[in-house]
From Swiss-Prot:
Pfam families: DUF525
Protein's UniProt name: Protein ApaG
Domain ApaG: 2-126
InterPro entries reported in the protein's UniProt record: ApaG_domain, ApaG_sf, Uncharacterised_ApaG
Record gene name: apaG
Organism: Shewanella sp. (strain ANA-3)
Domain of life (superkingdom): Bacteria
GO annotation, biological process: error-free translesion synthesis
Length: 126
C-alpha cells in the first residue's frame, strides 16, 4: 500500500438503460458515470483499470485493460476527470468494484480503489 492510495477519490453514479435492455433475453444494460478526483499534491496518470462485476446469480466477470474509454488521462492536483461507460448483466441486479492503476508525477505506482457499487433496476430494492 502506498501513501498515495488515498489521494484519489472515486465517485460513481449508475443508470439502468431500459431502451437497450431486453429482460426477456436476460440482458440488462447499465451505464455508470465515474468521477475521479485527485486530492493529492501531484498529478496522477490513470494507466490501467481492473473491474470485478458480479450479477445476482453469482456470475463473476473480470475486466482488465489499459486506461478507460480509450484514454489514459493525467489528472492534475485538485481536479477531476469524468467518463461514462456501461456493462450488461444477465440479471436486474449486480455489483461492481475494482481499482485503477495510477502513476504519480514523481513516477510512483499506486492503486486507486473503486468501492463496491450497485447496479439495479429502479424500484427493485428499497
Amino acid at each position: 500500500m502506498s501513501a498515495l492510495d488515498d489521494s484519489i477519490r472515486v465517485e460513481v453514479k449508475t443508470e439502468y438503460i431500459e431502451q437497450q435492455s431486453s429482460p426477456e433475453d436476460q440482458k440488462y444494460l447499465f451505464s455508470y458515470t465515474i468521477t475521479i478526483i485527485n486530492l493529492g499534491e501531484q498529478a496522477a496518470k490513470l494507466e490501467t483499470r481492473h473491474w470485478i462485476i458480479t450479477d445476482a446469480n453469482g456470475k463473476i466477470s473480470e475486466v482488465q485493460g489499459a486506461g478507460v474509454v480509450g484514454e489514459t488521462p493525467t489528472i492534475p492536483p485538485n481536479t477531476a476527470y469524468q467518463y461514462t461507460s456501461g456493462t450488461v448483466l444477465d440479471t436486474p441486479l449486480g455489483i461492481m468494484y475494482g481499482t485503477y492503476g495510477m502513476v504519480s508525477e514523481s513516477g510512483e505506482h499506486f492503486k486507486a480503489t473503486i468501492k463496491p457499487f450497485r447496479l439495479a433496476l429502479p424500484g427493485l430494492l428499497h
